[in-house]
Amino acid sequence: MKYLINKIKAITALTLVLATVGCDLELQDRFVFKPDVSLEDPYKDITAWQFLSSSQVNNQFNEDGTLIGDNYDYMSAAIAAAGLIDEYNTPNDGRTFLMLNNNAFLGNGDVIALVTGSPDIEEGETPEEVMARADLDVLRLILRYHIISTYITQNDPLVEFGVNYTFQTLIPGEEGLIVLRRDDRLRVDVNRSPAPLPSTATGGGNNERIRNYNYVFSNGIGHSLNDPVRNQPYPSPNI
């Protein structure tokens, strides 16, 4: 019993000492984490058109003099030539823009071939000059198919991975349907089999995986593609 009383006294004394010492310590400044990288969306205050036509993604070249493949020189020239600037510039926060980078215009089966009948461009020919010889009806059809009338991120409304989600583009009716599906790593495929679409959409290399994601604009959201996609074959150009 005496041992227990002495132990209690010792604990009490130690507590008083610690309390006294603790009172002499200054309060530490509250730690606030400041990330090195900004977590804000850098394009949230500009429209899709303002981004696509900006110097940030135009008039930049590789060492061999070719346009940087991930930029949008041809896309901005195509939008202007087709008279569709308003579709990319009008306030509307409920759209998804599938942005076709320079790579999507160059090569067999890509946009330049689809709208001019040939993938060839002359030496020194600018994107504006190429689009000046395009079939504008075909060009408008391609661009409208790459605007979806729903705001789509990698997981909203693509909530479940491995599930096909069907959306409507600016082309009305069945021919304007487009299908997106994500995997468990948040990679998103467009019109990839077994999407519930005609084989003209899912086969023959006409499906595509999104390259870069989630460009948040004041009038929607954008994702970039390395190749164009389709539902039905685009008409042959009348050149």
Enumerate the language-model features and the residues they cover:
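Bacterial N-terminal signal peptides that target proteins for export
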Residues: 1-12
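C-terminal motif of bacterial Sec signal peptides marking the signal peptidase cleavage site
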Residues: 18-22
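Mature, structured domains of secreted/extracytosolic soluble proteins
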Residues: 23-239
